[in-house]
Curated annotation (Swiss-Prot):
SUPFAM superfamilies in alphabetical order: FYVE/PHD zinc finger, Homeodomain-like
Assigned keywords, A-Z: DNA-binding, Homeobox, Metal-binding, Nucleus, Transcription, Transcription regulation, Zinc, Zinc-finger
Chain intervals annotated as zinc finger (PHD-type): 209-266
Annotated spans, Disordered: 1-29, 76-120, 302-573, 612-650, 662-719
Official protein name in the record: Homeobox protein HOX1A
Organism: Zea mays
InterPro entries per the UniProt record, alphabetical: HD (IPR001356), Homeobox_CS (IPR017970), Homeodomain-like_sf (IPR009057), PRHA-like_PHD-finger (IPR045876), Zinc_finger_PHD-type_CS (IPR019786), Znf_FYVE_PHD (IPR011011), Znf_PHD (IPR001965), Znf_PHD-finger (IPR019787)
Gene behind the chain: HOX1A
Length: 719
């Protein structure tokens, strides 16, 4: 009966067919419709009270709502058709067009609202479906490399580890996005929700407490009644407030439930998740139950990131708000000193490599050292407090003590041999005036370091508060101390310096002018202009002057551990021990080292090189005795031992014992460079017929010079 009453305006189409009655009395038709609706209002209230919530919640009762929405449009099209037929039968169309135009406007507005509402929930469905497809794609990639395959053939595949990690992170991100979608749906369902306390134990609610969640009104009419959702939202909606509007005949009857569009969208998304992932999510579950494992993993990753950050808690044990900033700086400097202790040795070694040309280092200012200022106007000034300059001196003295502890052996050698390392070695042909100038400069430079020199003379090196100025060092000596001396067959190799390298020329005059000596020892005497510095330079180049003549070998080479390196007294004692015992025991070496102020390594190396030179000398002596007669040998050795001398110097050759009692001793005054002396050739050219007939020593000397040059090149490249 209600449906007939609701469709009473539609049944009036029979009156419209008459044409005249419908056109002449339109007001009477509208009046009759209003009377019929007013009479059915009490009946609608009774029907509203009889609505109960369905027992079987969760069932979708609006499966065909989308398809039935077109029936309403067809009814409107019928109205349009009826309007056209009535206008064709009657000549006046003014009364027919008046009530039809508002219906067209309402139809356009309903289309726009219908499109927006359906788009909102349809976009949610599409979004969830897209995210699930993305998850399936990434999961298939992981499973493709996780499976072993037929006969474990898939184990041989190259696994893209980075790609698999990216896939896992993408799956986690997709799960979090789905959780956000369900959270959005739950927020939509919470709008306009009826309080659960208004429902009784049977699930019924009074009609006075029901209101529309869209418009908020509790008024209901016959064709626009309020219907409750049987989902999880517990909300009510007017039939016309829904999008699309719900017709009365589409309302499910009996125990069949009805779902609002939001609950319908939620249950569709839940069905997709349950189908693809095998989960068991219901419509009454909240969004927190959707992929809870993904949320836990995300929280763990956030906590791990938070653990790496320093704490901002002011209750830390090492925090003292009353501590002044100066003490904090002092603690930082102490901690930095401990870290720098390990690298002090390397810093000291870098300091040793400084040259004399480098300017002295400028002391740091007080501000650079982060020390408190001593201004009396400062608030933190304490005249009775400790002096900061003394602390700096103590700190620098500790650094210097570390430096001196690494170079104790070096300082002992300086105290034994004097200050020979201050000035560079001089050439034998240098002028006397130049040597005096260099000696004066050395004295002036050494006078600036009087405190340090006195300490070195005493054999004790005390720390100094200021920076030490770098002196010229003998790097070859330092290299030999660190890596040991390389034994060679010639004294020129051991006594080599960077200023007396031989110059090789192609012509005979260049060979005559070559400064490469033949190994004899030179002593300058009866010359009043010769200074003590010249003797020291010749002493450092050609060996010890005080050594006995009998200590020379047949080839005139000083192949011991750098003659004059330890001083004449130490060398004399070492030679005496070597004559008595060439192979001393370890205890004897230790006693010698303790007695002479040397290290065990230096003493051991000296004996090794001395034995090697003795073996080489004996082997060469045997070769020369076999090939040459005694007379030729004496003349040849004497010629090979005589070096090139500067003009005006007197040369005295040492007595060389080769064949029993045969000795040669003579004096010669060297003339201009390239002149020949009787019995000897300065440039290496032949003089007498014996040497013309026996060119063996000259060839041997050339080969020896060539070997020396090759060895020097190797040492230069090795450094």
């Amino acid at each position: 009966m209600e449906k007939n009453i609701a469709h009473c305006p539609v049944e009036g189409n029979g009156e419209i067919e008459n044409g005249a009655s419908s056109s002449q009395n339109p007001e009477s038709l509208e009046h009759s419709v209003l009377l019929s609706t007013s009479q059915t209002m009490p009946n609608n209230l009774g029907i509203r009270k009889n609505y109960k919530r369905a027992a079987n919640r969760g069932k979708k009762g609006s499966q065909g709502l989308t398809g039935q929405a077109y029936t309403l449009m067809s009814s409107n099209s019928d109205v349009r058709v009826l309007r056209s037929t009535s206008s064709s039968k009657t000549t006046s169309t003014e009364h027919v067009q008046a009530p039809v135009q508002p219906a067209a406007k309402r139809r356009k507005m309903s289309r726009a609202s219908n499109k927006s509402s359906t788009d909102e929930f349809s976009q949610i469905r599409k979004r969830v479906r897209y995210i699930l497809n993305r998850m399936n794609y990434e999961q298939s990639l992981i499973e493709a490399y996780a499976s072993e395959g037929w006969k474990n053939q898939s184990l041989d595949k190259i696994r893209p580890e980075k790609e698999l990690e990216r896939a896992k992170s993408e799956i986690l991100r997709c799960k979090l996005r789905i959780r956000e979608v369900f959270r959005n749906i739950d927020s939509l369902l919470s709008k306009g929700k009826i309080d659960e306390t208004l429902f009784d134990s049977e699930g019924e609610i009074s009609c006075e407490d029901i209101f529309c969640s869209t418009c908020g009104s509790n008024d209901a009419t016959l064709g626009n009644d309020i219907i409750l959702c049987d989902g999880a939202c517990d909300r009510g909606f007017h039939q016309n407030c829904l999008n699309p509007p719900l017709r009365t005949e589409d309302i499910p009857m009996g125990d069949e439930g009805w779902l609002c569009p939001a609950c319908d969208c939620k249950i569709d998304c839940i069905d997709l998740i349950n189908e693809l992932h095998g989960s068991n999510i219901s419509i009454e579950d909240s969004w927190e139950k959707v992929f809870p494992d993904a949320a836990a993993m995300a929280n763990d990753s956030k906590q791990d990131d938070a653990f790496d950050l320093p704490s901002d808690d002011s209750d830390d044990n090492d925090f003292d708000p009353n501590m002044p900033e100066e003490h904090v700086v002092g603690k930082d400097e102490e901690s930095s000193e401990e870290d720098e202790d390990g690298g002090s040795d390397s810093d000291d070694s870098d300091f040793l490599t400084c040259s004399d040309d480098s300017e002295p280092l400028i002391d740091k200012k007080v501000d650079d050292l982060r020390l408190p200022s001593e201004d009396s106007e400062d608030d933190d000034y304490d005249p009775a407090g400790p002096d900061s300059d003394k602390d700096v001196e103590k700190k620098s003295s500790s650094d210097e003590s570390d430096f001196t502890s690494d170079s104790d052996d070096f300082c002992k050698e300086i105290s034994k041999s004097g200050h020979d390392e201050v000035s560079s070695p001089l050439l034998p042909d240098a002028k006397v005036g130049d040597m005096e100038k260099i000696t004066a400069q050395a004295k002036t430079t050494s006078s600036a370091d009087d405190p340090m020199e006195t300490e070195i003379d005493q054999g004790v090196v005390l720390p100094d508060s200021r920076r030490r100025q770098a002196e010229r060092l003998d790097y070859k000596k330092l290299y030999d101390e660190a890596y040991g001396e390389a034994s060679s067959d010639s004294s020129d190799d051991e006594e080599w310096s960077g200023k007396n390298t031989p110059i090789i020329k192609s012509n005979e005059e260049g060979e005559a002018n070559s400064p490469a000596g033949k190994g004899s020892r030179v002593v300058h005497h009866n010359d009043e202009l010769t200074t003590q510095s010249t003797k020291k330079s010749l002493h450092s180049i050609h060996g010890s002057v005080d050594e006995k003549p009998g200590d020379l070998t047949s080839n005139g080479s000083n192949s011991t551990a750098r003659k004059g390196h330890f001083g004449p007294v130490i060398n004399q004692k070492l030679h005496e021990h070597f004559k008595t015992q060439p192979y001393p025991s370890r205890s004897v070496k230790e006693s010698l080292a303790e007695e002479l102020g040397l290290t065990f390594r230096q003493v051991n190396k000296w004996f090794e090189t001395r034995r090697h030179s003795a073996r080489v000398a004996s082997s060469r002596k045997g070769i020369s005795l076999d090939k040459h007669s005694p007379q030729n040998t004496n003349s040849q050795v004497t010629a090979s031992m005589e070096p090139k001398e500067p003009e005006g110097t007197v040369v005295e050759e040492s007595n060389v014992c080769l064949n029993g009692g045969t000795t040669i001793s003579k004096e010669a005054v060297s003339s201009k460079v390239g002149s020949r002396t009787p019995g000897s050739d300065v440039g290496g050219s032949k003089v007498d017929s014996a040497e013309d007939q026996n060119p063996g020593p000259d060839l041997a000397e050339k080969a020896r010079q060539k070997a020396i040059q090759q060895e020097l090149r190797k040492k230069k490249m090795g450094r």
